[in-house]
Amino acid sequence: MRAAVFVCLLLGWVGVATPRRLRGPQADRLAITLYYEALCPYCMEFVTTQLNPSMVRQDRLPFTDLTLVPYGNARTNDDGNVECQHGVMECELNAWHACILEHHDIAQSLKLIACMMRGKKNRLEKCADHYQIDVGDVKNCKKTRQVNDILRKYGKETAKVSFQGVPAVALDNVYNADLSANLTDHFDAIFCAKYKEKFNKQLNNCQ
């Protein structure tokens, strides 16, 4: 994925990521911020095969301050309209993800978003039924607001960090292009190492 990730391209440099959601004592949680877009194949692969298995199967989520930013390489034009790299459908799906994040905690949000990213169509109903999560508030969010309005704040957050491509991963509130590329291929192993380095604690199932 490291070489292929540049298919979803933007410009690259080192920047600082600002966390949006805190979950418990900061001393116990390593901040991870994912900048992504719903229909980028490499974002879909990363979320479903790297991030979600680490957070759920390896139980890293209680030790993570995880922030998801569904905007990626989208652009907001002078009229305030958002144009997404993979077209109108991606903007719609990004907005659905944003509404999920606004109305559910990160654990439920990750379940729904990872499930949705296993396909290229809107799988919200199917995923909500699978996890028995009420998404009435999510539907109302999407129904009563314009996509441009829903995505505006995520565009502003994304503008704080410039990256070479998505998925882009900031660790401990800092984005580094080389580290991000490694994280997309070896997320759990690097998370374990960085967590131990920062907190001097060895997490379960870390080698």
Swiss-Prot record:
Residues 1-19 form the signal peptide. Keywords: Disulfide bond, Glycoprotein, Immunity, Oxidoreductase, Redox-active center, Secreted, Signal. Induction: Up-regulated following injection with the Gram-negative bacterium E.coli. Up-regulation increases between 1 and 12 hours after the injection, then decreases between 12 and 48 hours, and then increases again at 72 hours. Glycans are attached at N182. One of its GO terms (molecular function) is oxidoreductase activity, acting on a sulfur group of donors. The keyword DNA repair does not apply. Disulfide bonds join C40-C43. InterPro entries: Interferon-induced_GILT (IPR004911), Thioredoxin-like_sf (IPR036249). GO terms for cellular component: extracellular region. SUPFAM superfamilies: Thioredoxin-like. It is found in: Secreted. Its EC number is 1.8.-.-. Its main location: secreted. Disruption phenotype: RNAi-mediated knockdown in the fat body or hemocyte of flies infected with the Gram-negative bacterium E.coli results in an increase in bacterial load 24 hours after infection. One of its GO terms (biological process) is immune system process. It is an enzyme of class 1 (oxidoreductase). Belongs to the GILT family. Probable lysosomal thiol reductase that can reduce protein disulfide bonds. Involved in the immune response to bacterial infection. This is GILT-like protein 2. It comes from Drosophila melanogaster. The lineage of its organism: Eukaryota, Metazoa, Ecdysozoa, Arthropoda, Hexapoda.
